[in-house]
Amino acid sequence: METNFSFDSNLIVIIIITLFATRIIAKRFLSTPKMVSQETVAHVKDLIGQKEVFVAAKTYCPYCKATLSTLFQELNVPKSKALVLELDEMSNGSEIQDALEEISGQKTVPNVYINGKHIGGNSDLETLKKNGKLAEILKPVFQ
């Protein structure tokens, strides 16, 4: 006796998408929030205020590379006016990233601050550049 199993490919796709979406939702909304010490948060706030430009990045991140290229090559921000932290090369990089999430609500890198104000990530930086607002925000950096 031969059994013939036939699956609708659309059903398989729907099941895969449902499983993927369930995993994302569970991770985002049901995960335990990470506890960041207030000492670490204060330290990160101090780091943000040390220089006019602060960027938290990771060496392998293409968006981080694009942000650094925009700031330092295209816009010629003096490196002496910036603090760039490569979180993946730091022993406490994940703690710093968690503190940045608590401070700004942004977990991803790059995480950019200019003159102590949270700018966002690479797409936010590029939008400001495209709209002509980034040059205005950076004016104090060049004074």
From Swiss-Prot:
Positions carrying S-glutathionyl cysteine: 61
InterPro entries xrefs: GLR_AS (IPR011767), Glutaredoxin (IPR002109), Glutaredoxin_euk/vir (IPR011899), Glutaredoxin_subgr (IPR014025), Thioredoxin-like_sf (IPR036249)
Superkingdom of source: Eukaryota
Domain called Glutaredoxin: residue spans: 41-143
Gene3D superfamilies: Glutaredoxin
Record GO terms (molecular function): disulfide oxidoreductase activity; glutathione disulfide oxidoreductase activity; glutathione peroxidase activity; glutathione transferase activity
Gene Ontology CC, one term: mitochondrion
List of residues that carry Phosphoserine: 37, 91
Residues reported to bind glutathione: 58-63, 109, 122-123
UniProt KW Disulfide bond keyword: yes
Known catalytic reactions: 2 glutathione + H2O2 = glutathione disulfide + 2 H2O; 1-chloro-2,4-dinitrobenzene + glutathione = 2,4-dinitrophenyl-S-glutathione + chloride + H(+); RX + glutathione = an S-substituted glutathione + a halide anion + H(+)
Record has Translocase as a keyword: no
Keywords, in A-Z order: Cytoplasm, Disulfide bond, Electron transport, Glutathionylation, Mitochondrion, Oxidoreductase, Phosphoprotein, Redox-active center, Transferase, Transit peptide, Transport
GO BP annotations, alphabetical order: cellular response to oxidative stress; glutathione metabolic process
SS bonds (residue pairs): 61-64
EC number, as in UniProt: 1.11.1.9, 2.5.1.18
Transmembrane parts of this sequence: none
Transit peptide extent on chain: 1-30
Triggers of expression: In response to exposure to reactive oxygen species (ROS) and upon entry into stationary phase.
Described function: Component of the glutathione system which performs several activities such as glutathione-dependent oxidoreductase, glutathione peroxidase and glutathione S-transferase (GST) activity. The disulfide bond functions as an electron carrier in the glutathione-dependent synthesis of deoxyribonucleotides by the enzyme ribonucleotide reductase. In addition, it is also involved in reducing cytosolic protein- and non-protein-disulfides in a coupled system with glutathione reductase.
Note: Present with 31400 molecules/cell in log phase SD medium.
PANTHER family according to UniProt: GLUTAREDOXIN 2, GLUTAREDOXIN-1-RELATED
Family note: Belongs to the glutaredoxin family.
Protein name: Glutaredoxin-2
Provenance organism: Saccharomyces cerevisiae (strain ATCC 204508 / S288c)
